[in-house]
A protein has these predicted regions:
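Helix-loop boundary and gating motifs at the non-cytosolic
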Residues: 1-43, 220-227, 232-261
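Central cavity-lining transmembrane alpha-helices of secondary-active solute carriers
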Residues: 36-54, 262-277
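Helix-to-loop junctions at the C-terminal end of transmembrane segments
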Residues: 48-60, 274-287, 373
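Structural signature of the two symmetry-related core transmembrane helices
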Residues: 64-78, 289-305
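Cytoplasmic helix-loop-helix junction between adjacent transmembrane helices
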Residues: 94-133
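Intracellular juxtamembrane helix-capping segments at the cytosolic ends
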Residues: 102-115, 331-346
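Juxtamembrane intracellular "pre-TM" segments in multi-pass secondary transporters
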Residues: 176-225
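A late C-terminal transmembrane helix in Major Facilitator Superfamily
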Residues: 347-376
Length: 399
């Protein structure tokens, strides 16, 4: 039940994710200013992600940071309604991002500490799938509000209200774990397993027995971190300007503007399917290898978007929608895998590092994506994203 507040929080941010770029354009902003807003917000949230993770691990208190995140989102979204200045909007959004990430590390730790290691994949998959449904409903609400011609202020009030509900529910339902030890046990188990395999191989070699040493190596944490940054970079390059791209091809096809939200609803639906599948997979040993394959497929489908420019207006909308559904599916599986792996390889006290790495890549991609789209066109965006996805694939193969 403690996840219920996060459900409403994601509902609000699902609605905001598509509405905000369109709102910036509506008040006279440009693709470049969207990129600046997203990248500045992410850059400022990077050090605070690490700070929130350090503080919650140090004090063994997680609920207070979740409440801070949801309450801050409520207040700042309300303040959004008083501005039509792009510069002021960028400032408010940056402050909101700094406080918004306060719930990320505590949420990951709660899942890791409330469940045993063998259930981490299923637990992360259930959480992400459950909140993805909230995100999907938020997108549907955006479609409905757009169809009903709600103005910008009413939409922002609605987003703020959803975050207020999230705050109140979390105030009642979220509890700090009585004991925090599961991640420490996993770290000890990995060290003991590594040592026992080393002793076995050494004794076998002394006895003259031929053994394979291909599995006798520690995880390459640097490669894992590099892969996360590159994956986040490619994703942000592709998805930051994506609402504008979808809006353009929908207009070209003479379809209703509300269809933009519908396309991203289907993208989110692909994510829900991915999380449902992840809950059924229990083979922990396949997590590392499957992660690299998922990244490779993301790269291939990014290149597939190049075909959109060669098709008729209606066909381009159909292909873009299909690719976004697959992207949602692959991203869900990737996120479950990497969250579980991060709880193994990132030590306690640094639980915010996962969000820092995602933020570093996201900040760069949020700036580069709109800049490339505005300067060179969306075709270059798709090529660049595909190349960076393939570089991320190489990093995860090394890991």
């Amino acid at each position: 039940m403690w996840r219920l507040g996060f459900f409403f929080h994601e509902m609000g941010y699902g609605l905001l994710s598509i509405f905000l770029p369109l709102y910036v354009i509506a008040i006279g902003g440009s693709l470049f200013e969207i990129g600046v807003m997203m990248s500045v917000a992410l850059l400022l949230s990077i050090p605070t992600s690490f700070l929130w993770g350090y503080l919650c691990d140090r004090g063994k208190r997680y609920k207070r940071y979740i409440l801070l995140s949801f309450l801050a989102s409520t207040v700042l979204l309300y303040l959004f309604t008083f501005t039509s200045s792009v510069l002021l909007l960028i400032l408010l959004y940056s402050v909101m991002s700094i406080l918004h990430v306060a719930h990320e590390a505590p949420k990951n730790v709660l899942i890791a500490e409330l469940y045993s290691r063998q259930d981490w994949e299923k637990s992360f998959a259930f959480y992400e799938g459950f909140t993805e449904i909230g995100w999907l409903i938020g997108l549907l609400l955006g479609f409905v509000l757009s169809t009903l011609m709600f103005n910008s202020a009413a939409t922002l009030f609605f987003c703020a209200g959803l975050n207020l509900v999230a705050f109140l529910l979390s105030l009642v339902l979220v509890r700090d774990p009585a004991m925090v030890f599961e991640r420490g046990l996993v770290s000890i188990e990995k060290s003991v397993d590594f040592a026992s395999r080393g002793i076995f191989i050494a004794s076998s070699m002394i006895d003259g027995v031929s053994v394979t040493t291909t599995k006798f190596k520690r995880d390459n944490v640097n490669a894992f971190c590099g892969g996360l940054i590159l994956f986040s970079l490619a994703t942000s390059i592709l998805f930051t300007p994506m609402p504008i791209f979808i809006s353009d091809i929908v207009k070209t096809a003479a379809l209703p503007a509300g269809l933009v939200f519908a396309v991203f609803v289907l993208n989110s639906g692909g994510g829900v399917l991915g999380y449902a599948l992840a809950q059924r997979r229990s083979e922990q040993s396949t997590t590392k290898s499957s992660t690299s394959r998922l990244v490779f497929l993301r790269g291939i489908f990014a290149f597939l978007l190049i075909l959109v420019a060669q098709l008729s207006a209606l066909a381009s909308v159909g292909l873009a929608t299909a690719v976004l559904i697959v992207f949602g599916f692959l991203n869900a599986l990737f996120l479950v895998n990497t969250l579980s792996l991060s709880m193994e390889v990132i030590p306690a006290g640094k639980s915010g590092l996962f969000n820092v790495l995602i933020g570093v890549g996201g900040a760069g991609g949020s700036f580069l994506g709109p800049l490339i789209a505005q300067s060179f066109g969306f075709l270059t965006v798709f090529i660049m994203a595909g190349v960076v996805f393939l570089l991320a694939y190489v990093a995860f193969k090394i890991f």
